[in-house]
Regions:
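Non-catalytic structural connector segments
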Residues: 166-182
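Peptidoglycan glycan-strand catalytic modules in the bacterial/periplasmic cell-wall system
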Residues: 1-166
Length: 182
């Protein structure tokens, strides 16, 4: 939440300020610089068919796709609790690949990176998993340890700033070494 969608618990599936901000920055920059999708919008894009059609929303960058995504995100928010939305999101996203094996979902990533079930990981390990999300294959600790450490620590910074963890937990997690191999 602290890294992917700071307003997750207060929005209704979309956050218009984020959408407009990213639209503006992307137009000015002439390319995609920043995303404005909420966790719920990302879930809509990844999982759901539009109006029970076979055709998925997909990942094409079009205004019509974004409108479909917004509508579905609102419907998802009306149908599910925030906890269920977060669970579905974490179980459906891509965490990269190790030895040509794709890691879809947080449980698979936890098993492949740490050799643990998701319930067994600690704060530093969980923060590393979340740190993978913006660019999984460019942040795996076995291939890109500096980037993985930097991004993991940014996740911890965000969590501390938002009050999700205390100073002791923050300091302990930042001291933990990254895994050297899967």
């Amino acid at each position: 939440i602290a890294s992917e969608d700071k307003n997750f618990y207060v929005h209704y599936g979309i956050h218009m300020n984020s959408i407009f901000r990213s639209f503006y920055k992307n137009i000015i920059g002439g390319r995609t610089i920043q995303g404005g999708s909420t966790i719920t919008m990302q879930l809509a894009r990844n999982l759901y068919d539009m109006n029970d059609r076979i055709k998925k929303i997909g990942h094409k960058k079009q205004v019509s796709r974004k409108i479909q995504e917004i509508i579905l995100a609102i419907k998802i928010e009306q149908a599910y609790t925030k906890e269920k939305i977060l669970e579905m999101y974490l179980n459906s996203i891509y965490f990269g690949n190790i030895r040509s094996r794709a890691m879809w979902g947080i449980q698979k990533a936890s098993n492949m990176i740490f050799g643990k079930n998701i319930e067994e990981i600690n704060l530093a390990e969980g923060s590393l998993l979340i740190a993978l999300l913006p660019g999984p294959n460019t942040r795996l600790p076995f291939r890109h340890p500096e980037k993985a450490l930097s991004t993991r620590n940014q996740v911890l910074d965000n969590m501390f700033e938002m009050g999700f963890i205390n100073k002791y937990e923050y300091n302990q997690a930042k001291q933990e070494a990254l895994p050297l191999e899967p």
